Structure formats: structure tokens, C-alpha cells
Amino acid sequence: MNQKVDIEALHETSINSDQPLLRLQQVSRSFMAGDREFQVLKHIDLAIHTGELVAIIGASGSGKSTLMNILGCLDHASAGSYQVNGQETRELDDDALAALRRDHFGFIFQRYHLLPHLDAVRNVEIPAIYAGTAQTTRHERAQALLTRLGLGGHLQHRPSQMSGGQQQRVSIARALMNGGQVILADEPTGALDTASGKEVMRTLLELHAAGHTVILVTHDPKVAANAERIIEVSDGEIISDRRTAQTTQPAPEAQPATPPGPAPRRLLASLGLFREAFNMAWIALISHRMRTLLTMLGIIIGITSVVSISAIGEGAKRYVLKDIQSIGSNTIDIYAGANFGDSRAKSIETLLPSDVAALNQLYYIDSATPVVGRSMLVRYRNVDVDAQLNGVSSRYFQVRNIQLAAGITFSDQDARRQAQVVVLDHNTAQRLFGPGVNPLGQVILVGKLPCTVIGVTSDHKNLFIAGNTLNLWMPYETAAGRVLGQRHLDSISVRVKDGMPSKAVEEQIKALMLQRHGTKDFFTNNLDSVMQTVQKTSRSLTLLLSLIAVISLVVGGIGVMNIMLVSVTERTREIGIRMAVGARQSDIRQQFLVEAVMVCLMGGVIGIGLSYAIGYLFTLFVQQWEMVFSLASVVTAFACSTLIGVLFGFVPARNAARLDPIEALARD
């Protein structure tokens, strides 16, 4: 089905052609009222040629306005055929019909149908905006049309500042903006005084003389008498179609109406429409300042909450970490060698169990544990895995804060008697035994040594358990004496008592080890796990509080949707006017969506500004620490504002785009 309309072809082929410009064949229009069907038009046959001046006359309720709406593609026939220069309108979709209205027809309404918040020039420009005409071109054309119609001194006047006759002339200029090959005038003098009515009729006759096809819809025989052809409608039927004496005069040579210029390329036109949507949205928003402010209030509160909570959380984290940094970490490791990566470390065998015993005697040390390790082959039945064997003391799990999911750890007594017992990490237990088998009490081979599993660590991630390595632990004495055959240690892990300055303890440990060894053949590593935990906790708390604040954003978004739905209802007639002059459904949807996004973005900007103001006041009353704002939180706030505008503005925008232009124009 062909959905495109070649407007230029319509202009060209309609000139000096015997083919009717507009043809209705057996057109009927009916409406449902409850269970009853009312037929407004009945089997209408009508042909109108290019350059004609036609009057459709009839009493109120005769169906003449419905006939005009069908002729102008504002309405559709329930039955029959309507062709515009041979193009069947039933084959056209909504966008193609909008293109016909925009580029081919010009409407003049009895009630003018001007947008009250726009001046005369902007009202006239509307059809050209939807045609994608460049701003300068359409502005100049609008001014020229208004000046031609005697409104050169009223270009910046709004409808409320003009008389009825002046408003009607603005409506005529709007009808001519895109060329207006066919002018459809619905009771053009009905709301005017006699003098203004005559002026409007004189203008319409001049347009006819210039080659425009003019169709008047009226109930006044005096107005109809100006036409060269009068069609009388009664009860939905054409009861007469006659020529007047004026047809003896030579008909004007039909000239194509001059459009404002070639339309720009599609991309430029789309960008132009998007820019104009922003301009129109801005005008609409500032025209209702209080409503706009109330609409964005929820967004302002939500954005202020999110940004402020993020800043407070970051400030609190830095404040706490600053205190922790003054204490240091609570775990210190001692290794052989000068530093990490020392090639001589493997040959140094001076870390001994006696060093561990000496460290455990220090009052500022909570516990110290020896550590030896090696990668070993571990077997259970027919399952073999490579795992890291760690020979440690019973205090190791306390030092490293490793929790058990099942079983127990080995005791000092197990260590003294070199008990063949092991504790497995969660991953090792899963690999060896699989699901459904209780590892506790099972016997496995560590190298060639059979060992009984007495415990399994939890699946909780621990800094000291490598996530990509299988681990198991046995008493140091067992590992050194029965598996590895070594007396020296790989490392010593020390846990500092709570409240003790970690850095000072580290220095005491170095002094003790230097005294015992006589040379510095070791190095220490102070792990600040507490600091990392605080950072993680701080991030989690900030996220939690931010999620709570997001609820206010959602509430604000619902408020935006509610107000936008009300706005659609209040501006129904405006939507009908825009559709009548050629706006597509996508144009209407885009405008209301842009309005919603603009409301949310403005609310976001104000909310961020308020957050910084709160931060300034915060520093005046809280001296210990301050709110810390980040670029990420600001960018996130803007992103949230945009997303909320799109999500909660879509439904109102869709509802606006789905309005029927006839019903919309009929709204007060």
C-alpha cells in the first residue's frame, strides 16, 4: 500500500487538468452513539476542480462541516471514495494525511484557532515548522504574509491583543504559509462584525483570483453568493449544486500556491524539528510558570536527596578512613628476604617457630602464627586436584578472620601430636566431594599423607584466601614434619591487639626480629583490611540511602506524568490545531516528551544547585568533616532526570499523539 504523497506532483498535475482536484464518490459518514448509528453524510458525489471558488451551504446539523473535515483530511469517510488529484486517501496512513494537510490544504476556522501564548508571527510559522522549513525563511515569509494582509504593525501581538478580524487574518496567513493550494474556510465571517467580515471575504476573493482553490462552508446565503458555485447540503445529502452568474466571468488561471521554499534534507529537517520542539516546549513551560514549578518540585527534592546523600556518604567515608589511617592495619605479615620478589628469599631459612613463640609473648600482639605452604596433589578416591597446602597454627584462623561453615579447626594438642587433620576451603570441598557428600570425617590424601577432614570454611570471600586457588590447612607441625620436611617458615602472620597503633607495633616487631636474627633478612607487610572494610561498608550504606532517595525521584516522576496528563487535557485544542496544520503524531509525541524531559532536567539543575547550597551550609555547622561532591554523582543526577522525563513523559506524549484532530478542535 502506497503511503507517500508527492505534493509537488499534486501541484503540477492539478494545473490546467481536466481531472478534478478533489473527488468524492458515494461518500458516507456515520457515528455511533451508544448502540445507535447516526448517518451524517449519505452517498455524497462531488468533484471540485483546481481554481474553483465553491460555497457549501446548509443549516446547522446539515453535515456541511463534516463534509469540509473529510475534504481537508481531518476526518475519514465511513464508506465511499475520496481522492485528492487521483490519490485515494484510504490508502494513506496518518503521517501521509498529515503531509496533505500540511503541504496542500490551508484551514481558516470560525473561531480562528490561534495559540494564545504565541504572537502573530509564531502562529503563522507553525505549518512551516512541521514542513521542516529553515527558521529564517519561515520567519521572513510569515512577516511578509502578515504585512500583505495589513498586519505589519501587529507582528508581535498575541491573539488577546488583536480584534476578531485581525485574528482571522492571522489565520488566513497561517493557511497560506505552506502554499495553501486549497483553502478551506469554515464560517470565516461567522464571528466577525460586518466590516471585518467584508474584509475577510475580500481577502478570500483575492486568493481565488491568485489561483487558489477556495472552499467556503457557511450557513449565510450572502457569503455563499460570493462563490461561483454553490453546493447546498441538507440532512447529509447534496440537494443542489449550481453555478452562479459569476461563472460567466473568465476563470482565473490556476497557479500553484508558492510554498516557502524547498524543504531541507531529511537529517537537517529532523534536527530542525527537534530544535523547534525544544523552543515550543520552552514557550509552553514559561507560559505556565507556577504549574511548571509544581511539576518539577518532586524532581528537585529527589535529585537534591540523591546528590546530597552521596556527598554526605563520601564525606563520612573519608572522615572515618582518616581516623583509621592514623591507627593503621591490625594484621602484619613477616616474610624472608629484602622485599617482595627477592630472588634470595627461597634460600633464607631463618624464620623459625621460635620467632613465633617470641612474638606471642609481646603484650601488644593478639596472636602470631607460623605459615608454611606448597602446592600439593590432593586426592579423594578417583578425584585429583592441585591445592595450596598451608601449615599453620590453631590461631591462624583468628588472625585471618577465616570463618568455618562446618566442623572445627585443629587445636594446639593436634599440633603437638602432629595430627593428620585438615581444614578445606569451600572450593576444595566442592571439587573433591561434590554436592550431597558431607566432607567432615572423610579421609583424603595430601601428597602421600592420609588426612581426616575436620572443617570447611565458609563461602564468604576473604582477602587472604585466593579466589582462583584451592586451599587447605593443617597444623604447622604436621605439614613441616610429615609432608614438607622443612623446619623453617615461609612467613609469620601477626594480629595486633585492638586499640594498638599498628605502625608502632610493626616497628617493635622489626626490632625484635632484628635482635633475634642479628641481620635484617626479613621484611614486613602491614595489611590495612579494616580500611577496606570501612570503604566497602561506606559504599553500601551510601547506595542504600541513595536507593531510598530514588524513591522520591520516582514519586516526582509520577507527579510529572500526572501533570503532563492534565496538560494534555488542557491543551487538547492546541493539539488539534497543530494536527490540522500538518503536525504528525510523532511531532506531537516528540513535543510533549521534550516538555517532560525539560521539566525533569530543569528540576535536576535546581536540585544539584540546592545540594551544593546544603553542602555550604553543612560546613558552617559541622566543623569535623564536610560533604564531598563528585562528578559521577552530578552526571548520574542528570542521567536520572533525563530517564525519568522519558519514562514518565511517554504515556502523556503518546496520549496526546493519539488524539483525533476533529474531537480535539471541538474542545473548549
Swiss-Prot record:
Looking up SMART domains in the UniProt record yields: AAA (SM00382)
What cellular component GO annotations does this protein have?
plasma membrane
- Binding, ATP: 58-65
Name the segments for region: Disordered: 242-263
Compositional bias (Low complexity): 245-256
EC number(s): the record gives 7.6.2.-
Q: Where in the cell is it found?
A: Cell inner membrane
Family the entry assigns = Belongs to the ABC transporter superfamily. Macrolide exporter (TC 3.A.1.122) family.
Name of the featured protein? Probable syringafactin export ATP-binding/permease protein SyfD
Q: What is the species listed in this Swiss-Prot or TrEMBL entry?
A: Pseudomonas syringae pv. tomato (strain ATCC BAA-871 / DC3000)
What's the gene? syfD
